[in-house]
Curated annotation (Swiss-Prot):
Keyword match Membrane: yes
Transmembrane segment boundaries: 24-44, 66-86
Phylogenetic classification of the source organism: Bacteria, Bacillati, Cyanobacteriota, Cyanophyceae, Synechococcales
Family assignment from sequence similarity: Belongs to the Ycf4 family.
Keyword Thylakoid carried by entry: yes
Organism from which the protein derives: Prochlorococcus marinus (strain MIT 9515)
Topological category with respect to the lipid bilayer: Multi-pass membrane protein
Record-given protein name: Photosystem I assembly protein Ycf4
Length: 185
């Protein structure tokens, strides 16, 4: 969550989506691996080496060639899905807090349509810091709304910022919205 514009009356935060280096690396590996498995399957069927490495034409088509072809098809289906998410920049968007109009606007890029939430300041109960350490750490800022049990997350998925930065952003936002800050121990 990056603050692009912060003034006395307005805070805007850009949220990064699925265009991350890790997704590009995984997509590249899936592409190469999926095509490699399909070429190995075709090589075992035709008896001609289509890959520069190894000798896949010596594999029996049943069962090794068929299994490698299935792995290749599954890898390429996952690959198409992942590249689609990267292409549309799934999860990207912004958070906008405006003191003049007393409104909050949260917008994210969804799978098939954009997700947009508009709130008034009086609907916000508090700002919550959701911090958990361990094998799968989570550090996110969320809005606790009046009349709802679940908090509305403001941080992007997979963002892992330093603890001090998350605490400072949460405190600044709570002060701006004039609400309590929850989750500090």
């Amino acid at each position: 969550m990056e603050s692009n514009l912060s003034s006395f009356n307005k805070i805007e935060q850009q949220i990064n989506g699925s265009r991350k280096i890790s997704n590009y690396l995984i997509g590249g590996m899936l592409t190469i691996g999926g095509i490699g498995f399909i070429l190995a399957s075709i090589s075992s069927y035709t008896g001609r080496d289509l890959l520069p490495l190894g000798n896949p034409s010596s594999l029996l088509f049943i069962p090794q060639g068929i299994i490698m072809g299935a792995y290749g098809v599954i890898a390429n289906l996952l690959n198409i899905y992942l590249w689609y998410l990267v292409f549309i920049n799934f999860g990207s968007g912004y958070n906008s807090f405006d003191k003049v109009s007393q409104s909050v606007e949260i917008k994210r890029k969804g799978l098939f349509k954009d997700i947009e939430v508009k709130l008034n300041f009086d609907e916000i109960k508090s700002v919550k810091l959701d911090i958990s350490e361990g094998f799968n750490p989570r550090r996110r800022i969320a809005l606790v709304l009046k009349g709802r049990k679940k908090a509305l997350p403001l941080s992007g998925a997979g963002e892992l910022k330093p603890l001090l930065q998350v605490e400072e952003e949460g405190a600044r936002l709570a002060k701006f919205l004039n609400v309590n800050l929850e989750g500090l121990k």
